[in-house]
Amino acid sequence: LIEGHTVKIFRSKSFTGERAWAALDIANMNGITTRLHWTDQPYKWHVNDGQEVFAVLDGRVEMHFKEDGVEQSTILETGDVFYASVGTAHVAHPLGVARILVVESEGSV
């Protein structure tokens, strides 16, 4: 982290959490949070009460999601972005270590 008076620069590749899904808070803009997550373990199935943007900054992630009650999955590579609308059930399974930028409503699971 390089910090000035009005800017912060985060070097995502140098962030390592003490546990899976550890997060570094980057910003909270009117109740919308931006957090950098580090993980090497799957999350849990969940449904957000708001929209979610999930950007893979480093590594690969298999994202499972349900559309019309049917489970599907896709591999997200570094640079890929997953968008989940309100009410979309999903779960992320990193394939090794991954660093992920998540933008969502404050307090989301």
Predicted regions and their residues:
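Short loop/turn motifs at secondary-structure junctions and domain boundaries
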Residues: 17, 45-46
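A cytosolic small-molecule/anion-sensing beta-strand core signal
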Residues: 30, 57-58, 77-78, 96
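Short, conserved beta-strand element in jelly-roll/cupin
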Residues: 38-39, 47-66, 103
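Short, surface-exposed secondary-structure edge patches
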Residues: 44, 53, 72-74
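Short acidic-glycine-tyrosine-enriched beta hairpin
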Residues: 67-86
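Ligand-binding loop in jelly-roll beta-barrel domains
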Residues: 86-109
